[in-house]
Amino acid sequence: MFLLTTVPLQADVTATFVHAGPAELSNPHDLKLSPDGRYLFVSDVGNNRVAILDPDSLKVIGSFGSDHQSGTHDIDIDSAGRAYVADTHNSRVTIYTIDAMHAKLIGELSTRIRGPEGVLKHPNGRIYVAGAWSNNVVAYENGKVVMELKGLSAPHDLELAVDGEGIWLADAGNDRVLLLSPDLVIKRELSRESYRFDGVRYMDILADGTLIAADKNNHQIKFISPDGSMPLVLGDGQPGRGPGKFTTPEGVEVSGKTLWLSDSGNNRVVRYRLNRLP
């Protein structure tokens, strides 16, 4: 079993159910909190848009993209207020400037990707995109492809590792999570055999390096600590609705002690509070 980072885990974590939003989305996937914490942006796949939720009530208060997106799967937002959206069924990533709840389309990327379902704006300036239909990850620099990793199977999420350089990739069709270098070299593998993944999708990272992954077809959220152990699993492996129950969950976003999850099969977002055990 592989170590996730060199940062020690200080304490185990528990998660307490807080609130479930209304079922007003359609197969929500990954989500992202705005840099100022005021808005929760959700990839609303079935509605071909990015839905904007109040982070507390989890009600939809706005949206953008429904007039030109198709099958929206992922969103990332950089510190400058630009949003990068996996416009999956159009086989492109759309780029926007964001001002509160207003989005302006300013560009797109589509070279050598089909059906993108994951996007990451890296601190190194590159934009990394996972092509779920083309089974690859490409790195764009100044709008041009500079690197490519082939031989994947329906790759999904891309998340920045805690060291600020590495990239975690959900290689969904192979039921594994990979740690990549910025040059797309595979450094580590979290395998199906070790973690019983079945369609691992979107992820986020705690400050200590703990990886939180939505294991879609197991209807679970798995916490994998830096020492490779799995101290917490939310969900009993069966589809459901209610505290600690999910149906094909996809999206994960964490900020401080708050954890938001896309309970995709139930068409809603749920919120949990993270607690550390002494």
What is the meaning of each model-derived region?
Residues 7-33, 38-42, 272:
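An edge-strand/N-cap motif at the start of beta-rich repeat modules
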Residues 15-22, 59-65, 102-109, 144-150, ...:
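A short beta-strand motif characteristic of beta-propeller blades
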Residues 22-35, 67-79, 111-123, 151-165, ...:
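Beta-rich, blade/repeat-based domains predominating
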Residues 42-46, 85-91, 129-133, 167-175, ...:
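Conserved beta-strand positions in repeat-built beta-propeller and related beta-rich domains
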Residues 54-58, 97-101, 140-144, 181-185, ...:
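Short loop/turn segments that connect beta-strands within beta-propeller blades
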Residues 61-123, 128-134:
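A generic tandem-repeat structural signature
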Residues 248-278:
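Blade-level signature of beta-propeller repeat domains, shared across WD40, Kelch, NHL, RCC1
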